[in-house]
């Protein structure tokens, strides 16, 4: 997996404490879903630490065709329906590449948001935590897992990262506070990070 273990665990715990963590099995892999993100990992490809984190919170991994939402108190069985759960298919259909720029701004609540920009200079914002989590250096080099591709977008209003065993969807964040700044930045080409899938230790800018 191209996600750092610590960030992965924190993401799951926050989902359980919030609107619930959906854990599903579509027969080919495991789907995990929070309030603003979805990921899918191919069967047999979840590392031991990450699998242990899922079982610790959910109590079990669902059987093929099953899904349930994990809350603090209990698990509730659900049905995975809708295009959002076709995680890998959606990722593979994306055609537009977004550069991860060097600029980080903050929304009205102080949350750091990373600016991503495509070839048309269009800008989207995502939670900075995902830039910190995505790291190709944590891949299992003894396996056939490939590095994650660049951030991409397609017909769904999400940002996607994926490789040959997993896919991650992240919902962009809208912020009225920085609306004028975004319009201004879309008039120029922003410098991108040198290492897109390493921790974000670059110089950050706030507004």
Residue ranges and their predicted role:
Residues 46:
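Flexible glycine-rich active-site/ligand-binding loops centered on an Asp-His dyad
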Residues 1-41:
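Intrinsically disordered, low-complexity linker/loop segments enriched in Gly/Pro
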Residues 34-37, 42-43, 52-207:
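C-terminal functional regions that serve as terminal interaction/effector modules
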């Amino acid at each position: 997996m191209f996600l750092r273990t610590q960030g992965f665990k924190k993401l799951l715990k926050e989902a359980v404490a919030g609107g619930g963590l959906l854990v599903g099995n579509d027969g080919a892999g495991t789907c995990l879903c929070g309030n603003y993100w979805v990921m899918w990992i191919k069967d047999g490809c979840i590392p031991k630490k990450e699998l242990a984190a899922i079982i610790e919170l959910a109590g079990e991994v669902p059987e093929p065709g099953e899904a349930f939402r994990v809350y603090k108190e209990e698990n509730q069985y659900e049905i995975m329906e809708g295009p959002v759960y076709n995680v890998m298919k959606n990722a593979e259909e994306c055609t537009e590449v977004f550069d991860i720029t060097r600029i980080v701004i903050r929304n009205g609540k102080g949350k750091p948001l990373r600016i991503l920009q495509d070839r048309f200079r269009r800008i989207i914002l995502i939670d900075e935590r995902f830039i910190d989590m995505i790291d190709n250096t944590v891949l299992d080099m003894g396996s056939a897992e490939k590095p994650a591709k660049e951030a991409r977008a397609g017909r769904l209003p999400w940002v996607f990262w994926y490789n040959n065993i997993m896919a991650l969807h992240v919902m962009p964040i809208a912020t009225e506070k920085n609306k004028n700044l975004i319009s201004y930045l879309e008039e120029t080409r922003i410098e991108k990070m040198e290492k897109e899938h390493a921790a974000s230790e670059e110089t950050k800018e706030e507004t």
